[in-house]
């Protein structure tokens, strides 16, 4: 089931991931929401090495970063992003793929899921394994999120 009649701007606001714009929401065969997003932040076309904004698209890529559920239901993100050519002659990087603070380069998990997982392990779960299972993450990712959360908390003192 595809829902194209909803306002993309409203859906983007509801998703709440800065820099991503909702293009389409559909239900898969199991009734799970599949949210197709594109990059809505022009700064993502900036080369991570030299900072020059690119205007030359090299290709496209699709990633599926995991995110927090929407209420009790999981949400599957499908990010249709662009691969850019860096046009700066002095830059050693030939090309790069869009990334955002909410979904960093090569990340398979949104920063908000990492943050929620780390906080959950610190406050609600008796061990990292329980938190990892609850959030559907691997133990190393859940542990890293917990360490980040703990480090941030301890640094304040």
Predicted segment positions?
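Short, conserved DNA-binding cores of transcription-related domains
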Residues: 1-93
């Amino acid at each position: 089931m595809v829902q194209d009649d909803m306002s993309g701007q409203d859906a983007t606001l509801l998703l709440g991931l800065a820099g991503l714009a909702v293009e389409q929401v559909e239900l898969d065969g199991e009734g799970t929401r599949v949210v197709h997003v594109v990059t809505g932040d022009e700064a993502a076309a900036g080369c991570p090495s030299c900072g020059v904004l690119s205007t030359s698209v090299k290709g496209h890529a699709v990633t599926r970063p995991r995110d927090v559920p929407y209420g009790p239901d999981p949400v599957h993100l499908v990010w249709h992003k662009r691969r850019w050519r860096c046009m700066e002659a002095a830059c050693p990087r030939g090309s790069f793929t869009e990334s955002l603070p909410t979904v960093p380069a090569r990340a398979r998990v949104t920063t908000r899921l990492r943050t929620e997982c780390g906080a959950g392990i610190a406050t609600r779960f008796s061990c990292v394994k329980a938190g990892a299972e609850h959030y559907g993450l691997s133990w190393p990712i859940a542990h890293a999120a917990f360490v980040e959360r703990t480090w941030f908390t301890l640094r304040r003192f």
